[in-house]
């Protein structure tokens, strides 16, 4: 998820979710991405996040947190210092599951880690990797065709076009444009942003994206949230994502507002 917090990523989120008051702070030791809307703190409609020295980030977070009613934060690898501070102030975390692929592995090992039935499906056709800004328009049309309507503003698509230009994203699509995905790359991480298909298997899209992210030097590829019970569609999507290998990681999620 760390790849989503570039300047363009934050601008995209504000186009998508509305204006936030930027309270982010940084120096040579750390960077804390945090914004305020009303009395709610988040990372511009995503979890608050820090890079670098957590102790410096905690001091900054404490100053910003004062007077806020609620917060959205993910504690990685157990209860970190900011998470402990939130628990001490009465906040209760819940587990958040996400699927992450280790791109330091070799390509043959990554292929072997996939579900056996996926290994052949991944080679069903040869997808194309694109960073051409104009291709965002073709992806937008596919998105509209699959959804039956336009689900977000033109400005969000314009921001993703800028992300392609800046090298912070890439598109993988089938030769026929019947399937495509958008992937966000930044800070050595790659995140599966969105994918759409008109019935064509998406397995080659994901496998090509994993290999391309590794080629770009990314060390991790995050497939996204894992849901194990409840909504059948979300459970099915999660099962599909797990088929590409990796491990299911647990973060502690503090989120006391919708």
What are these regions (language model features)?
Residues 1-39, 78-199, 212:
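A conserved beta-strand-loop-helix scaffold within acyl/acetyltransferase catalytic domains
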Residues 31, 42-43, 59-64, 167-258:
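Aromatic (often tryptophan-rich) hydrophobic motifs at membrane interfaces
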Residues 45-84:
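A gly/proline- and charged-residue-enriched helix-loop-helix capping module
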Residues 53-57, 152-155, 201, 205:
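Soluble or luminal CAZymes and related metallo-dependent hydrolases
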Residues 54-65, 83, 122, 157-161, ...:
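Short amphipathic alpha-helical segments and helix-helix/interface helices
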